[in-house]
From Swiss-Prot:
Keyword Phosphoprotein: yes
Entry's localization field: Cytoplasm
PROSITE patterns per the UniProt record, alphabetical: HTH_LYTTR, RESPONSE_REGULATORY
Molecular function terms from GO: phosphorelay response regulator activity; transcription cis-regulatory region binding
General function of this protein: Member of the two-component regulatory system LytS/LytT that probably regulates genes involved in cell wall metabolism.
PTM comment: Phosphorylated by LytS.
One GO term describing the cellular component: protein-DNA complex
Keywords on record: Cytoplasm, DNA-binding, Phosphoprotein, Transcription, Transcription regulation, Two-component regulatory system
Name this polypeptide is given: Sensory transduction protein LytT
Response regulatory domain span: 3-117
Originating species: Bacillus cereus (strain ATCC 14579 / DSM 31 / CCUG 7414 / JCM 2152 / NBRC 15305 / NCIMB 9373 / NCTC 2599 / NRRL B-3711)
One Pfam entry name: Response_reg
């Protein structure tokens, strides 16, 4: 089953698209969102195969999400599902898989799913062809674009990554860096065995946690080795406690 996220600020449009997708019996709807902010949070939690994305959203437009996804290491496929036909060229400039127009047509959606499966099969065949020469290098450093240069930071020294005063900040044991990367990009770069998202705006290195303090309304604060505090939202508290077996 293909995992699908539906992003549209109109509930009726979301419901119609979900209905048609489920009729194909090839997809599982793992989430939906009506704005950019919620869509990005859903993306990080559910990791879909395909995102069906409207262009005009309540807080911005779908191209903001598409541009973020384009920078990810293994991004989901993007299918723009919109009432506007004038953005087709721009859609394919951000590597969209397909561009479908409202009102939705079931046969057209089936074609899109076939296109996705064909593309994935082609990628698998290409990987098999180069498998004999593929070399994996274990990286212990994170490359951070800082102003006009790139700084290499030891991954094990990173305490947390977060949005501080509106800027994406990487805090290490000794230094604080403000980077041009987004939280979404950094989450893809960091090893999941050591780092987890604990808040919409924070990713913590679990190896640096020394104390977990209850806060309010089922939220928490993490006390890190070098003394900083990292908030844990209700959304991520359960997953964190499960990971730490508490």
């Amino acid at each position: 089953m293909l995992k699908v996220l539906v992003v549209d600020d109109e509930m009726l449009a979301r419901d119609e698209l979900k209905y048609l997708l489920e009729r194909t019996k090839e997809v599982e709807i793992i989430g939906e969102a009506d704005c950019v902010e919620d869509a990005l949070e859903e993306l990080m939690q559910s990791r879909p195969d395909i995102v069906f994305l409207d262009i005009q959203l309540s807080d911005d437009n779908g191209f903001e999400i598409a541009n973020i996804l384009k920078k990810m290491k293994n991004p989901p496929a993007i299918v723009f599902a919109t009432a506007y036909d004038q953005y087709a060229l721009q859609a394919f400039e951000v590597d969209a898989l397909d561009y479908i127009l409202k009102p939705f047509d079931e046969e057209r959606i089936v074609q899109t799913l076939k296109k996705y499966k064909k593309q994935k099969q082609s990628q698998i065949e290409t990987k098999h062809e180069i498998k004999g020469t593929d070399v994996t290098v274990e990286m212990h450093k994170l490359a951070l674009p800082i102003e006009e240069s790139i700084v290499l930071v030891n991954i094990e020294d990173i305490v947390y990554v977060g949005l501080v005063d509106g800027k994406v900040t990487v805090k290490t044991m000794r230094e604080t860096y403000v980077t041009h990367d987004t939280l979404v990009i950094l989450e893809k770069k960091l090893p999941q065995v050591s780092f987890m998202r604990v808040h919409r705006s924070f990713i913590a290195n679990i190896n640096h946690i020394t104390e977990i303090q209850p806060w309010f309304n089922s939220t928490y604060n993490l006390i890190m080795k070098e003394g900083s505090k990292v908030p844990v939202s209700r959304t991520y508290a359960k997953e964190l406690k499960k990971l730490l077996r508490i």
